[in-house]
UniProtKB/Swiss-Prot annotation:
It comes from Pseudoalteromonas translucida (strain TAC 125). GO terms for cellular component: bacterial nucleoid; cytosol. Belongs to the YbaB/EbfC family. Binds to DNA and alters its conformation. May be involved in regulation of gene expression, nucleoid organization and DNA protection. PANTHER family: NUCLEOID-ASSOCIATED PROTEIN YBAB (PTHR33449:SF1). This is Nucleoid-associated protein PSHAa1202. Homodimer. Residues 1-20, 87-108 are annotated as: Disordered. It comes from the Bacteria. It is found in: Cytoplasm, Nucleoid. InterPro entries: YbaB-like_sf, YbaB/EbfC. GO terms for molecular function: DNA binding. Pfam families: YbaB_DNA_bd.
Length: 108
């Protein structure tokens, strides 16, 4: 009886590991758009945190360099936050709401 229970538990752990790997693969290709300055600056970021595109509104070309740099940083930070939110939501679905410790990734 113990062997059957342990075997079932191992099977469930493997299934969860497979689902988490699939979710991680999907997250890596996820695209989010971070914005700053009411959409004047947009940063498109992939789920693996690679920046794919930066868009600047034409009206910014007349503004000073410091403001543009601040808006770019804010848009990047917004994109990073959005990736983190999406990752948490998708992984929560896979783990049934069980929160993994920070930095812990599946598969182990």
């Amino acid at each position: 009886m113990f062997k059957g229970g342990m075997g079932n538990m191992m099977k469930q752990a493997q299934q969860m590991q497979d689902r988490m790997q699939k979710a991680q693969d999907e997250i890596a290709t996820l695209e989010v758009v971070g914005e700053a300055g009411a959409g004047l600056v947009k940063v498109t970021m992939l789920g693996n945190h690679n920046v794919r595109r930066v868009e600047l509104d034409e009206s910014l070309m007349q503004d000073d360099k410091d403001m543009i740099e601040d808006l770019l940083a804010a848009a990047c930070n917004d994109a990073v936050r959005r990736v983190a939110d999406e990752t948490q939501e998708r992984m929560g679905k896979v783990t049934g709401g069980m929160q993994l410790p920070p930095g812990m990734k599946m598969p182990f």
